[in-house]
Amino acid sequence: MKEVSLRGISKTFGQLTVLDRIDLEIHSGEFLVLVGPSGCGKSTLLRMVAGLEPISGGDLVIGGERANELPPQKRNIAMVFQSYALFPHMTARENIGFGPRIRGEKAAETAAKVDHAASILNLHSYLDRYPRQLSGGQRQRVAMGRAIVREPSVFLFDEPLSNLDAQLRVQMRTEIKALHQRLKSTVIYVTHDQIEAMTMADRIVVMNQGKIQQIGAPLDLYDRPANKFVAGFIGSPSMSFIPGTVADGFFCTGEGKKIAVSAAAKGARAAEAGIRPENFVIAREGAGLTLVVEVIEPTGPETHIYGRIAGEPVRAVFRERIQLAPGEQVPVTAGSEHIHLFDKESGLPL
């Protein structure tokens, strides 16, 4: 296990800056997730740590050693890709043992490493099968086994679950987290799926347009987003945003409807109120905001409502079965502690 430090890391392609002075400390044994929309630079950053992409500026330090010019094989890292990158003409056993074999390790030592990895990943029944004979989840476990036998100081995962169906993704993210808890290794994991980030990470790094937006524990980001982008990106279903103004302890929409907000948000100014779907509650008649119902989705334990408030699309999740019809107008509100206020122009919290 080693610490990884990124100090002012930048990446440019000609005049295009794709990563802008990234500063980040990954602790030894930490499971750190880089999350953000496509094109935010997260995979490029991971490839720079791996040595697959040259660094344009700044310093990469692995285990106290500057690694900018260190070749990938000297960094003592292992990477699991989105595509499984398995040799089709080799069995699972041969794929897992390929690295030690080409490094000239003894056959008995290689076999022991393969057996150890297979035990961790529950792969013994599949070791003599070829990749074409394995399911997507089994192939990904073989790819993980190939990483484990390297006995690396740092594991890198580049969207490893993107090619799997929804059920397999849930299963595999549980297995990857269990693997980390067993090996206690340093993990840097890239995904665009914030559910993966929330359920797996010790800390999350939210990125957008080549910059870090916020770093923190999953629930810290959920409860205290640093800006409107983080608030809208973290959470599923995502936060709804309603434009209006803040004045004298109330948030007012353009329709004249208002709800109480925190006392710290006093002072008239244009703002947006962010409310998470599960924080909406039915208000008394004539109070709160008016939700115009468009679509109702009963799921059994919950009722999901898609509609509009002050003309803006919102989603509300109620923890009970309620009977509503499209076009119906429902008074809703939220506790002031659950209303996130953002400046209309900057997107920063008020």
Curated annotation (Swiss-Prot):
Alphabetically ordered keywords of this record: ATP-binding, Cell inner membrane, Cell membrane, Membrane, Nucleotide-binding, Translocase, Transport
Membrane topology: Peripheral membrane protein
Name of this chain's protein: Putative ATP-binding protein BRA0745/BS1330_II0738
Function noted in UniProt: Probably part of an ABC transporter complex. Probably responsible for energy coupling to the transport system.
A Gene Ontology molecular function term of the record: ATP hydrolysis activity
A GO cellular-component term linked to this record: ATP-binding cassette (ABC) transporter complex, substrate-binding subunit-containing
Entry's family note: Belongs to the ABC transporter superfamily.
Domain ABC transporter: 4-234
Entry EC number(s): 7.-.-.-
Species whose genome carries this gene: Brucella suis biovar 1 (strain 1330)
Subunit structure: The complex is composed of two ATP-binding proteins (BRA0745), two transmembrane proteins (BRA0749) and a solute-binding protein (BRA0748).
Biological-process GO terms, alphabetical: carbohydrate transport
Keyword Oxidoreductase attributed: no
Compartmental location: Cell inner membrane
The protein's enzyme class: translocase
